[in-house]
Curated annotation (Swiss-Prot):
Gene Ontology terms: biological process: defense response to Gram-negative bacterium; defense response to Gram-positive bacterium
Keywords in alphabetical order: Amphibian defense peptide, Antibiotic, Antimicrobial, Disulfide bond, Secreted
Organism: Odorrana hosii (Hose's rock frog)
Subcellular localization: Secreted
Protein name: Nigrocin-2HSb
Length: 21
């Protein structure tokens, strides 16, 4: 759903910013 999509995007952004990808 929309909420899951937003949460998934947030996790990707946090991953990229933290460099833990």
């Amino acid at each position: 759903g929309l909420l899951g999509s937003i949460f998934g995007a947030g996790k990707k952004i946090a991953c990229a910013l933290s460099g833990l990808c």
